[in-house]
C-alpha cells in the first residue's frame, strides 16, 4: 500500500471500443429548505438506483445490480452529488462481483462523489468481491466542500471460498476544499508482488477501510488506536489524518469479521 502526493486525478484506462458495457449512473441530492430531495436518479447498465424511504432526515438510495458485472472490458461509473445542506445515504443491495470477461482487457469502475457546503454523504455499499481471473481497476474520487461531512466504507474480498484473488487495483483520492486529504493506491492478486506477504495481507482475504470527515472532528481528541482482539485473525487501526478526518484500515479472514472492525471504528469516531 502506498500513499501518493502527485497526480491526484485518477485516469481511467483506455479500453478498446466495443470491448464491454459502458454505463454511468447518476444521483443528485438537493435541499429545498425543508427536506432533502432527489431531483436526479439515473440508472444505467448494471446499476438500478432505487429510492428508499428517508430515515433520520437523510434521503436514501440503494444500488441494485441489474446484471453481472463488472466483467473484463466493462467501463462503469457512478456519480453522486450531495448539494449544499443535503443529506444523502447510498447503500447496495448485494456485493459487487468482479468476474472474468470475454476479453483480457481490464474492467474499470469509477466512483465520483461530490459533497457541498454543510452537506452529508454516507457511502455504505456491500463488499467488492474479486474473483479468480477477474481484472478490475476501481477508483474513488471524492470532492468535499470545507464544511462537508462524509462517511465512506470500502471493503474488498479477495477471492471466493477456496479461490485465489483476481487482479484488483484500487485508488481512493479525497480532496477537501480543493486540497489533498488522502490519496491511497493499493493492488492485490497476480501480477502484483508481495500483496499476500506479511506487510500487506498475509493469509487474510478480507480488507477494508472507513473514512470519516467532519468539520467538528478534532484529531487531537482521537489518538491512534488498535481495533479488534489481538487473539483473533482480524486486525485494524483507527488514526487521524492531517485534517478533520479519521481513517480506519483493517484486514480479516472473513467479511463478517471485517465489518465488525469497521463498525467498531465508526462507533469510536462518534464517541467524543
Located regions from the model:
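N-terminal intrinsically disordered, cationic/polar leader segments
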Residues: 2, 6, 14-18, 22-24, ...
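N-terminal, charged/glycine-rich beta-strand/loop interface patches
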Residues: 2-127, 132
Amino acid at each position: 500500500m502506498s500513499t501518493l502526493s502527485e497526480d491526484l486525478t485518477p485516469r481511467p484506462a483506455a479500453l478498446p471500443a466495443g470491448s464491454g458495457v459502458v454505463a454511468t449512473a447518476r444521483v443528485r441530492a438537493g435541499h429545498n429548505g425543508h427536506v432533502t430531495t432527489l431531483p436526479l436518479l439515473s440508472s444505467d447498465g448494471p446499476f438500478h438506483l432505487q429510492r428508499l424511504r428517508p430515515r433520520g432526515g437523510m434521503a436514501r438510495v440503494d444500488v441494485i445490480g441489474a446484471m453481472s458485472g463488472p466483467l473484463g472490458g466493462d467501463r462503469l461509473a457512478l456519480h453522486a452529488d450531495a448539494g449544499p445542506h443535503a443529506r444523502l445515504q447510498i447503500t447496495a443491495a448485494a456485493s459487487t462481483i468482479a468476474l472474468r470477461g470475454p476479453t483480457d482487457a481490464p474492467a474499470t469502475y469509477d466512483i465520483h462523489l461530490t459533497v457541498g457546503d454543510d452537506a452529508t454523504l454516507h457511502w455504505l455499499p456491500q463488499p467488492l468481491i474479486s474473483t479468480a481471473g477477474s481484472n478490475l481497476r476501481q477508483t474513488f474520487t471524492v470532492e468535499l466542500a470545507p464544511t462537508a461531512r462524509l462517511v465512506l466504507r470500502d471493503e474488498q474480498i479477495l477471492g471466493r471460498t477456496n479461490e485465489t484473488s483476481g487482479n484488483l487495483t484500487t485508488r481512493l483520492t479525497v480532496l477537501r476544499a480543493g486540497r489533498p486529504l488522502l490519496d491511497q493506491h493499493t493492488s492485490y492478486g497476480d501480477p502484483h508482488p508481495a500483496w499476500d506477504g506479511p506487510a500487506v495481507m498475509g493469509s487474510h482475504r478480507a480488507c477494508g477501510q472507513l473514512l470519516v470527515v467532519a468539520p467538528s472532528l478534532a484529531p487531537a481528541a482521537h489518538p491512534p488506536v488498535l481495533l479488534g482482539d489481538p487473539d483473533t485473525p482480524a486486525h485494524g487501526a483507527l488514526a487521524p489524518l492531517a485534517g478533520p478526518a479519521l481513517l480506519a484500515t483493517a484486514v480479516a479472514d472473513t467479511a463478517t469479521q471485517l465489518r465488525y472492525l469497521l463498525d467498531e471504528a465508526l462507533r469510536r469516531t462518534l464517541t467524543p
